[in-house]
Amino acid sequence: MLVDDDPDFVEAVKVIVESGGYDVRVAYDGQEGLEAVAEEKPDLIVLDVMMPVMNGHEACEKLKGDPETSGIPIILLTAVAERVTTSTYSHRDMLESEAEDYMPKPVEPVELLELIKSWLEK
């Protein structure tokens, strides 16, 4: 599942993920994402941090706090921090959200597919 509020970004990432052989469901904010997960639990969620209605950290917190969805791997997408950074901001956000991983925007297609594959194989 992909949750992001930018329709152009969603379409681009959807094409990337589908090229890896994965089915992709889409939601455009955290609340819509929670509702979609309640209908059908995905194997993995790629979740943007900054969105209207409910941001990615709030959605991640709700998903990880629910026994029904706590085991679903979540990859946060952020335009704020680089993946390789050791900044306080990056680590604090990662720990507070309980997400399994994160990736900076703009995403690198090959890296995103590798990250998705690695979490689905665990």
List each model region and its residues.
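Conserved sequence signature across two-component system core domains
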Residues: 3-4, 27, 45
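Two-component/phosphorelay signaling modules centered on CheY-like receiver
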Residues: 7-25
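Alpha4 helix (beta4-alpha4-beta5 surface) of REC/receiver domains from two-component response regulators
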Residues: 14, 58, 81-103, 110, ...
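Active-site beta3 strand of CheY-like receiver
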Residues: 40-46
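Helix N-cap/capping motif at the beta->alpha junctions
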Residues: 26-35, 56
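Short amphipathic alpha-helix used as the core "switch/output" element in two-component signaling
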Residues: 35, 57-70
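Receiver (REC) domain active-site loop signature in two-component systems and cognate sites
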Residues: 51
